[in-house]
């Protein structure tokens, strides 16, 4: 059983919703994640989505775009992201770590090499928002060879036949986008979310994890009524962005504790 599958099985048995914070590698400082991830795990994070900075992050809203730009300015590239995961494992972080990055840097690095190096560092999967299932065969094969889960997005606008195609390739969990458009914190969840998740569930037994727009403990509780987990990205990056340099780790951990409830 993979570390991701084991985590969801354990949380399901405990009746808990998985909380998956998003951190950008290299933000706000080059090695901030080395302090943030252990603190957030202690505060109640169950898994991590770890952003790989990219110059044109099409799926991301303004908050994560700013974080990506800052990380790039800090000199962070894919190799540093892989090295960061290895250091986190050396420092005792046990939660699954799933890097999220765009396809072009991964392709340039080499997909087999990427899967090998990510797995060796201690990553558990890959999220590639601009990789359609029709073009995912090579990446899927590389991930399978090295024991990584390949995570795909489904959105409210995704037709049923495409959901079936995506879920046939996916492993680990299904990333269910809670709204149309780019990432960003929202005040209220979409009222159609339960029906959308039920539609996805007809095609898979994998855990459903909801992202985009989740920003409060109430959101996490509501998502937990219908899905296995919740991803909190822009709201957490906002907390870090609005903190003084010496305070962002403590404030981020406090926010995760509030989300956990």
From Swiss-Prot:
Q: What is the lineage of its organism?
A: Bacteria, Bacillati, Chloroflexota, Chloroflexia, Chloroflexales
Cleavable signal peptide: none
Q: Name the EC number(s).
A: 4.2.1.20
Gene3D superfamilies in UniProt: Aldolase class I
Q: Which GO terms describe its molecular function?
A: tryptophan synthase activity
Catalyzes what?
Answer: (1S,2R)-1-C-(indol-3-yl)glycerol 3-phosphate + L-serine = D-glyceraldehyde 3-phosphate + L-tryptophan + H2O
Q: Does the keyword Lyase apply?
A: yes
Q: Does the keyword Transferase apply?
A: no
Keywords carried by this UniProt record: Amino-acid biosynthesis, Aromatic amino acid biosynthesis, Lyase, Tryptophan biosynthesis
Protein purpose = The alpha subunit is responsible for the aldol cleavage of indoleglycerol phosphate to indole and glyceraldehyde 3-phosphate.
Q: What class of enzyme is it?
A: lyase
Subunit structure, interactors included = Tetramer of two alpha and two beta chains.
Catalytic residues (positions): 49 (proton acceptor), 60 (proton acceptor)
**What is the name of the protein in this document?**
Tryptophan synthase alpha chain
CDD domains hit by this protein = Tryptophan_synthase_alpha
- Which Gene Ontology terms of cellular component type are present? cytosol
Which species is listed as the source? Roseiflexus castenholzii (strain DSM 13941 / HLO8)
HAMAP family in the cross-refs:
Trp_synth_alpha
Q: Give the pathway listed in the UniProt entry for this protein.
A: Amino-acid biosynthesis; L-tryptophan biosynthesis; L-tryptophan from chorismate: step 5/5
